[in-house]
């Protein structure tokens, strides 16, 4: 009796356990249905988020040109990067983080999106996944309206590195190992932030020269995978692919698994050293004026369309004076990117504004005969030469420019100018403005002074003469040929100037001016 009881008790326990297990399984599958592979849909959805690179195909390592990178986001969006030749379509694809969407049902992953106006779909079965590796079977895809069946087992590794910013800069190859046909110790590559690059070779003298026969030079980095393409003028597009093994401490290592026509394989590796960072491009974004860009690119430091940090440190002069047959520059925007500038020489253009507040080392500015209406010089304390003759200035602040020796602001629309703090002033021209008074600095070095075609007279002329230093020189004070001349200097004031060593001169005749018999 006892044995029978024990048997029934055991049987009940087993049935209860089975019932509980069945209930648990059913409850679990309602929330997290089992997939044919034994994986749960929820687990796949959780673990697939991130960046994955295809590395094996049917158990064999994929050559580098067959790699691609997929990045899955938690919201069902994804990107797909590839640069692959499709034999059945006889064309390359160039996908730089192309946007797609994805969905997961059971263990079936569907990727879809529009490319070139066509719906693209691909279907995979996830057979295994963890946080480092994933296995999928690529079953079929729809491309250009055609359906293609596949039975391709693809292995993926999770990509944690992102070298898309680290690669930007100028790199020089230092070492190469692998196939002889890839041997190259004579190359520089400049990777730019806009997805283009520049290729350089050494000439016979050992100088680096830009290879300028290429119409296209593009690249992208997705994670640790680099794809490049280029096209020689009149030639076909070329493609190349690399795994970036590391970028660290100014050194970059690439590797690529290649396959020969006979099916044998080899690995090529390159080691690069970083020569310099890229400071900026000579492009429309940084330099909106096309002629200014052209003039910059005529200089050695910018002839390849970019400026490195190393080159930037040596740029202290920008010369772009207008010459016959050249377009006039309308804007010098971008000049603020040159912090080492000491000289800007750009007379004879149509410049309307000039921002030099970031060029604190400037010593000389010449933008004569342009269309500048205002200029901020408060951040340029080292200026010693300033030529703004022939512009449209109505005011100017020189309070932070005490080192000026030569100051030319003639032929503007100034109603006032204060130069009293400029103690080293040697040459000063402020002719053809609307000045009604002018007090000169206490500068014993002052030698050249042109003030004609203004409105200085009477007590203001007395004050001007009183501020003249005692030395022999010439005061260009009147232009008798100008019917609009409003300066007035009397014979008594001419005599007062002469007593200090200054000869009053009529600009029209270049002769001594005797003075007026009346003050107004």
Locations of the language-model features?
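Bacterial Sec-dependent N-terminal signal peptides
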Residues: 3-5, 18-49, 149-164, 272-284
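N-terminal glycine/threonine-rich, aromatic-flanked beta-hairpin/loop signature
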Residues: 62-110, 114, 181-227, 231
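Edge beta-strand at a domain terminus
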Residues: 138-172, 214-218, 222-223, 258-280
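N-terminal capping/linker segments that flank leucine-rich repeat
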Residues: 164, 254, 258-259, 266-345, ...
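Conserved hydrophobic position(s) of the canonical leucine-rich repeat
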Residues: 171, 315, 341, 351, ...
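Conserved hydrophobic beta-strand positions in leucine-rich repeat
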Residues: 316-321, 344-346, 363-367, 384-388, ...
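Canonical leucine-rich repeat
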Residues: 332-335, 354, 375, 396, ...
């Amino acid at each position: 009796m006892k044995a029978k009881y024990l048997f029934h008790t055991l049987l009940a326990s087993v049935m209860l356990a089975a019932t509980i297990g069945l209930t648990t399984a059913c409850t679990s599958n309602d929330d997290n249905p089992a997939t044919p592979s034994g994986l749960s849909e929820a687990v796949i959805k959780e673990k697939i988020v991130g960046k994955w690179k295809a590395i094996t195909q049917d158990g064999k390592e994929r050559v580098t040109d067959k790699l691609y990178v997929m990045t899955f986001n938690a919201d069902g969006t994804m990107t797909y990067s590839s640069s692959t030749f499709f034999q059945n379509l006889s064309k390359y694809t160039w996908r730089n983080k192309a946007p797609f969407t994805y969905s997961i049902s059971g263990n079936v992953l569907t990727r879809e999106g529009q490319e070139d106006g066509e719906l693209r779909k691909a279907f995979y079965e996830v057979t295994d996944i963890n946080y480092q590796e994933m296995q999928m079977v690529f079953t079929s895809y729809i491309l250009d309206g055609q359906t293609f069946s596949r039975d391709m087992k693809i292995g993926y590794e999770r990509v944690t590195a992102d070298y898309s910013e680290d690669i930007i800069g100028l790199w020089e190859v230092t070492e190469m190992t692998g196939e002889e046909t890839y041997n190259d110790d004579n190359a520089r590559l400049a990777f730019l932030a806009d997805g283009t690059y520049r290729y350089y070779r050494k000439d016979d003298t050992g100088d680096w020269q830009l290879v300028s026969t290429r119409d296209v030079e593009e690249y992208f980095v997705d994670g640790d995978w680099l794809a490049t393409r280029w096209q020689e003028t009149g030639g076909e597009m070329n493609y190349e692919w690399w795994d970036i093994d590391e970028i660290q401490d100014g050194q970059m290592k690439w590797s690529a698994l290649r396959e020969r026509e006979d099916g044998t394989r080899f690995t090529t590796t390159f080691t690069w050293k970083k020569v310099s960072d890229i400071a900026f491009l000579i492009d429309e974004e940084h330099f909106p004026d096309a002629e200014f860009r052209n003039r910059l690119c005529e200089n050695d430091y910018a002839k390849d369309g970019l400026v490195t940090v190393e080159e930037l440190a040596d740029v202290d002069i920008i010369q772009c004076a207008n010459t016959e047959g050249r377009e006039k520059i309308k804007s010098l925007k971008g000049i603020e990117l040159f912090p080492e500038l000491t000289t800007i020489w750009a007379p004879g253009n149509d410049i309307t504004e000039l921002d030099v507040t970031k060029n604190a080392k400037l010593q000389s500015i010449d933008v004569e005969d342009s269309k500048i209406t205002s200029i901020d010089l408060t951040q340029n304390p080292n200026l010693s030469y300033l030529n703004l003759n022939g512009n449209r200035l109505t005011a100017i602040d020189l309070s932070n420019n005490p080192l000026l020796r030569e100051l030319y602001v003639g032929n503007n629309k100034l109603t006032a100018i204060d130069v009293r703090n400029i103690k080293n002033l040697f040459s000063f021209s402020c002719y053809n403005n609307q000045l009604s008074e002018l007090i000169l600095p206490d500068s014993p070095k002052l030698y050249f002074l042109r003030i004609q075609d203004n409105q200085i007279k009477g007590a203001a002329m007395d004050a001007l003469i009183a501020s003249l230093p005692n030395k022999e020189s010439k005061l260009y004070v009147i232009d008798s040929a100008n019917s609009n001349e409003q300066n007035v200097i009397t014979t008594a004031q001419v005599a007062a100037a002469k007593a200090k060593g200054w000869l009053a001169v009529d600009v029209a005749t270049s002769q001594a001016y005797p003075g007026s018999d009346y003050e107004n």
